[in-house]
Amino acid sequence: RDQPRSRGLGDVYKRQICHSFAEDGRCISLLKIMLTNYCIYDCAYCINRRSNDIPRATLSVSELVDLTIEFYRRNYIEGLFLSSGVVRNPDYTMERLVRVAKDLRLVHKFNGYIHLKSIPGASRELVNEAGLYADRLSVNIEIPKEENLKLLAPEKDHKSVYQPMRYIQQGVLTNKEDRKKFRHVPRFVPAGQSTQMIVGATTESDKDILYLSSSLYQHPTMRRVYYSGYISVNTYDKRLPALKQPPLVRENRLYQADWLLRFYQFKVEEIVDDSYPDLDLEIDPKLGWALRHPELFPIDINQADYEMILRVPGIGIKSARQIIASRRFSKLGFYELKKIGVVMKKAQYFITCNELPTRTVNELTPTGVRRLLVPKPKKKVDERQLILNFTDNE
């Protein structure tokens, strides 16, 4: 428990409470907790690997259920995010995870959100049972390429990950057909499934990662791929890169590219290719694409179709829809676009309208626009240097 004097307005009550966003934009507080940090696997990138000499603990099913209910009653949380290290075997661990969700739903009539981590290698029966009580199931791919997974986690393979993914997908599709025939059939994993990849622990390029993500999104039940910048926890293992800090900028760029794939109708080959296998860390992927294709710009904001407006840097989905709706009544200028929410600092170089000057990407060149939009690096000041500020008031 935190010391009372260290807690103030807005402090999270427990470190185990995390925040997730629902598809409708709501922020949900979740109790993020592990059943146990014991594990039979010795994955090089994991702090809970078998060979690590760290404190270990295991919660019983009843302890987890009681903890969740108490937090829920006190309005600390709106749901549970439950994962676990693998003890004994995948089925044994998965059975305990299912029991937690089952007891919450059936015994305590818990109607909050439940996200369960499905254990790779668990049986179809247990995955199907978990889907009856969980809102979302996830199976983590962890390392995008199997040869690199084998290098860092020799006891694992991608087959054990993709198999439960297929179980979940088949369960959702079967449930959808059953609900057409019978009204009272319980829903199966209504929030779909997700997965996660570790970024920076191995040699995969952003191109490799995004092509894998794109193929996963072809499956109707895959709602989200998460990217986690590698945190250097086992520095003694020579198979791992020596990173001073997690690649957070790269992680953010992957999320931006992922957003373009899911909502902006981009294809992977438009974002990364053989010439540009990694995302630019200085600019976002949409701006990067626009600067590589100056021949497509500028576009007339009062005439262009929705799909092309979406591709303009500084214009999001909501703004694009408002532009289409608003221009039916009058022509849009600088003031109207800014009021709609367009980031004119970026967009002005890629669009034309009545009031904008003609300093577009074609006049300034992509290099010139990039120079204007990339923030200048701040000069580092030697902390040992004494700085004297002289003002007229002294």
Where are these regions (language model features)?
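Single conserved hydrophobic/aromatic residue that forms the stacking wall/gate
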Residues: D2-L9, Y13
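N-terminal pre-triad scaffold of radical SAM enzymes
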Residues: I17-I47, Y72, G79, T195
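Conserved C-terminal portion of the radical SAM core fold
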Residues: K145, S160-D237, P246-V272
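Long, highly charged, low-complexity intrinsically disordered interaction regions
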Residues: L240-L310, K346-P377, E383-F390
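Residue-level signature of tetratricopeptide-repeat
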Residues: S326-R327
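Short, electropositive alpha-helical surface patch
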Residues: M94-K102, L106, G131-N140, G200-H219, ...
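Core AdoMet radical
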Residues: R49-L64, F71-L97, D103-R124, G131-F182, ...
